């Protein structure tokens, strides 16, 4: 079952606004929230970073340059 997660990147210096993206992730049990499990949230975060970079024409190295080193994910209810 596909579950939607919102991936948000924050600038640690506070100079830039947060950027976010919605990512669909295939999951067996939709009632389980993967945002708490550190191992299982890594592919969700990676997909979100790739989608944000593609949307803004950035490379992955630019994220660190702009200070986007803090990440949060949350489950999006439909």
Tell where the protein language model's regions lie, with residue ranges:
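Short, surface-exposed loop and linker segments with low hydrophobicity and enrichment for Pro/Ser/Thr
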Residues: 1-4, 40
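A short beta-strand micro-motif
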Residues: 3-12
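N-terminal functional modules and adjacent low-complexity/disordered segments of proteins
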Residues: 4-5, 29, 57-61
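Generic low-complexity segments that are intrinsically disordered, proline-rich and/or Lys/Arg-biased
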Residues: 7, 19, 28, 44-47
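Short, low-complexity, intrinsically disordered N-terminal modules
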Residues: 10, 31-35, 46, 59
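A structural detector for beta-sheet-dominated domains
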Residues: 10, 25, 35, 74-76
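A short, exposed loop/beta-hairpin motif centered on an aromatic-Gly-Thr core
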Residues: 16-38
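Short, mixed-charge low-complexity intrinsically disordered segments
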Residues: 40-78
């Amino acid at each position: 079952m596909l579950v939607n997660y919102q991936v948000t990147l924050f600038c640690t210096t506070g100079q830039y606004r947060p950027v976010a993206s919605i990512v669909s992730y295939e999951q067996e049990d939709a009632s389980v929230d993967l945002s708490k499990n550190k191992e299982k949230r890594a592919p969700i975060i990676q997909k979100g970073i790739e989608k944000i970079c593609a949307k803004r024409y950035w490379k992955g190295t630019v994220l660190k340059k702009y200070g986007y080193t803090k990440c949060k994910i949350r489950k999006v209810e439909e």
